[in-house]
Amino acid sequence: MVVLAAVAEFIPGLAKWRLLGQTPNGATAVLPRLAEHKPSVGESALTEESRGDSSNSRPETTRPASAAGVIAATQGAAVSADSVESKPPPVHLEYSQDRALAHFYQALKRTSHTEAAFTTRVVHFGDSLIASDYVSGTLRRLLQKQFGDAGHGFSLIANAWPSYFHEGVSRFATSGWLVSRVVGPYAQDGWYGLGGVSFRAPVNTLARVGTSTKGEFGRRVSRFELAYVAGPSGGAIRVRIDEKTVGELSTQRDEKAFKTARWQVVDGPHEIEFLTTRGTSRLFGVVMERDVPGVVLDAIGIQGARLRFLDQQDDAHYATQLKWRNPDLVIYEFGANESADGLAYSLKDFHDTMKAVVDQQKSAIPESSCLVIGAMDRATRKGDTVTSSSFIPLLVAEQRAVAQEVGCAFFDTYQAMGGRGSMPRWVRRGLGQADLTHPTAVGADIIGTWIYRALMERWQ
């Protein structure tokens, strides 16, 4: 069973399921390398069931883990997201244009005034952190606590990666899905849906998505929406809600087209199930929303992704996905994999491709606000010497420059952490993982809280 990496950080018996990090008793973990880009066209089969239910969920209030291991030889002062939630963030949002977040704040104003159950929507793109709902899960929870829970938003139909997980939603899918991703293997037509993953489902492939049974958020839903492709090679899907069959969805059509199907339910706890009964259907993901004022945050995490990989999508199809969700705020949080590339991919190319991706977004949904979250500090260890990467400040400078150029707000995570040398300190305090690249669940909670507080500074 796939278990959320964050849970494994707190339970020694689940150490093998950790996304990245330390093993018990101070041993150094065997860590997967940051994903390298190996382009190919085709599909890979998911051989494991997808599970993500309330029993796996991270607690809504997390506490620091112990800092065991050769790097974290001494335990630093305990820090939790609780201790920073009511304080100003260590850095403020940067703007090149005063109205960089005006549309987002206007949407929040309409939501806070309960205007006809107005929903403020956020799409949060990122790499492996967001794939496990790190940072994004905290930001969703805090925004919904302040402005209302309007539903979980988008999640993939199945787990495209073992570490894929979303807070506040229950999910299950059988094995057997055939998958193409923007990180490879590629789809021939460049159609990956909002989540950057295309799933083909042979007969008797099943997926279920439902409300959470634990915690304050994600407990109710008013409607489900399935994103799929209809076309000549489509099939049929039996749809059940709360274990009752509500009909059959045909995914056949003379010409290929992106489609969505909605099912309205009485606001409350519900579960929807999709079972392919004929032919092969191509699906992307499911949206859960409510007919109440509040915030919805779609966490679009792609393991191994660089921001430029979003441009692997067919341009017209990608624009259709953005227009479908029509977010009031688009967030980009990348940098870990780009930092692994170093200067093998030039800073000019990084700048140009990042700008091209954001320009695509602004062309498709010109009214939406955007926020770039800068890369974290990263370090390497040789023997007893730990050194922060000299490339990170260069990468952050390009992220800031693009944000200024295209009119996005910018949050400098690197400086918020403490700048050069901060990741080793984070590891000693239980906030950074042993790979010296990723935060722990608690560290991610703190970053998410900082971003929320930075957004609320201007709102207030």
Located regions from the model:
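Active-site-proximal beta-strand/loop segments in catalytic clefts of secreted hydrolases
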Residues: 125-128, 157, 299-303, 332-337, ...
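Conserved SGNH/GDSL esterase-like catalytic core that processes O-acyl groups on lipids
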Residues: 130-352, 438
